[in-house]
Amino acid sequence: MSKRVTSSKKSKIMREDSENDSAKNLSKTSKSVSKSKEAGSKRTKQNSSKSSKDLKTTKNIGGSKSSRTYNSEGSKNIKKTSSSKDSKVIKKNKQKVESSDSEKHSENKSHKKSSKSSSISRKKPIKKDTRKINIELVSDSDNNSDSELNGVDTTGDDIIYLKGEDNNDEKQNKKSPKKLLNEKKISSESFDDKLNELREELRENYIRQKKIMNDIKDLANLHKKDLRLAVKSGNRLNSGKHSGFNKPQTVPQSLKDLLKINDDVLSRSKVTELMYKYFTDNKMYNSKTKREIIPNSKIKKLFGMKEGDIITFYNMQTWLKKVYNENQNNEKLEE
């Protein structure tokens, strides 16, 4: 029971402490609020006193009328006039400040220009050009011309040196923007014309190239036809000529005696035909193969054959060649 009592006492003490703390905080906040109110009231009083002083000064500046009227309605009018006068004074002060600023700005500009001109004069000295102009004096009846020429010596060719003509020449040489635009238009037109001319030339060249290529093709075809015709005509012309085996040659005496040939000159193809006829007449073909020829004593002697040698249709020309070569060698020896 004692423990419960102590815990309840502690809780009561804690509650009382918290209530006291909250009361203290409230008193502090109320004091701070009252202090802030007092400070605000003091500030408002000071501002009001300052404004009243300003009004008094404006009354003295404005003249006698504003100083004599102190009624409630008159006080309003005085305030209005004082505000308008203050605005005028402020405007005048602003104008003075602006005028002083503009003067300073102009002075700075002039100082910069003078510094630039001095630097330019140091860097690049100005050359004054002088040009000679011959003036021919003409005697006119007018008094004005005489009066103008009284101060000029009329003896001989008078020479006057004029300065600063380059500027006039430059002004004359300067072209107006309209003239420049016209020149640009003319240049663009001339450029377009040249482009069109070049395109036309390219087209003409392309057409010419096509024509030339077609002519080349036609010539090539004609040449091929001529070659074909020449080959055909050459074959026809050379058909009567003899060459190789068809060429007539002197027949050896041994073959004449064997084949009973009366002509001295015959082609080798004709001689082979006579040889095959001789083989068939004498039944010299092999009955089994019918490709080999069984030679007799005369053929062996003619061709100079040995044991084991065979005559066929494939090696017939080699045996005949042997006979023709022996005949040619004998003729050379006789000569």
UniProtKB/Swiss-Prot annotation:
<feature type="compositionally biased region" description="Basic and acidic residues">
    <location>
        <begin position="83"/>
        <end position="109"/>
    </location>
</feature>
<feature type="region of interest" description="Disordered">
    <location>
        <begin position="1"/>
        <end position="182"/>
    </location>
</feature>
<feature type="compositionally biased region" description="Polar residues">
    <location>
        <begin position="60"/>
        <end position="75"/>
    </location>
</feature>
<feature type="coiled-coil region">
    <location>
        <begin position="181"/>
        <end position="217"/>
    </location>
</feature>
<feature type="compositionally biased region" description="Basic residues">
    <location>
        <begin position="1"/>
        <end position="12"/>
    </location>
</feature>
<feature type="compositionally biased region" description="Basic residues">
    <location>
        <begin position="110"/>
        <end position="126"/>
    </location>
</feature>
<feature type="compositionally biased region" description="Low complexity">
    <location>
        <begin position="24"/>
        <end position="33"/>
    </location>
</feature>
<dbReference type="InterPro" id="IPR036885">
    <property type="entry name" value="SWIB_MDM2_dom_sf"/>
</dbReference>
<feature type="domain" description="SWIB/MDM2">
    <location>
        <begin position="244"/>
        <end position="326"/>
    </location>
</feature>
<protein>
    <recommendedName>
        <fullName>Putative SWIB domain-containing protein R508</fullName>
    </recommendedName>
</protein>
<feature type="compositionally biased region" description="Basic and acidic residues">
    <location>
        <begin position="163"/>
        <end position="173"/>
    </location>
</feature>
<dbReference type="Pfam" id="PF02201">
    <property type="entry name" value="SWIB"/>
</dbReference>
<dbReference type="InterPro" id="IPR003121">
    <property type="entry name" value="SWIB_MDM2_domain"/>
</dbReference>
<keyword id="KW-0175">Coiled coil</keyword>
